[in-house]
Amino acid sequence: MDIPALRERAETYFGGLAPTHDWHHVERVVENAETLAGRTDQTVDEDVLLGAAWLHDIGRKRESDGEIADHAEWGAAEARRILETQGVDPATVDAVAHCIRAHRFSNDVEPESREAKLLSDADNLDAIGAVGLARTFAYAGEHGRTLHDPALPPEVDDSPAGETSFNHVHKKLLRIRDRMYTDAGRALAADRHAFLETFVEQFEGEVAGER
């Protein structure tokens, strides 16, 4: 598998995307994946992991533009086509496609392979901690989402993703730590989760005029 060529090809799918899912997000996920792979004592097929990491969000722009419903499903199919043109063997193509299908937080596709679990963890790590908070509030700016509504605390917000940015932190970000699949992922997530908890405490204190 020609990873540098895949990287170049993948980048062509990201023109005009907003910061929450731009090319820099992909680069961070790749860095996370490499870190996690280096901290596991099990054998990892790095071609599968890195190929999937570079390609995992190639369907994002189409989904954002309303052309497709599920960027993970479309991206897996598109990745198959790309890899087949490289002459990659069918088993590896299948493995990469599974990683891409299973990486999405809201999908019901369970990651089965070690590489799929590592990619899922790598992607989820970019949704928590300082970067996760930055992306949450960038999304608020992109879509006009309310920062915080004191009349709608998280415990009475019925939206699965949270109606406000602060509620999104509670509804999604603070739950990601418990969705990690690997020991290495859980270790990194613990530190980022602690940062989120510190932020929530500080935010609530400032909103109440107590800090």
Where are these regions (language model features)?
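His-Asp-centered metal-binding catalytic motifs of divalent-metal-dependent phosphohydrolases/nucleases
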Residues: 46-65, 71, 75, 79, ...
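Short, well-structured alpha-helical segments
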Residues: 23-30, 46, 50, 93-101, ...
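Terminal disorder- and signal-encoded targeting elements
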Residues: 1-8, 211
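Divalent metal-dependent phosphate-bond-processing catalytic cores, especially two-metal-ion Mg2+/Mn2+ enzymes
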Residues: 17-23, 31-42, 55, 108-211
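Alpha-helical phosphate/pyrophosphate-handling elements in metalloenzyme active cores
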Residues: 17-49, 71-90
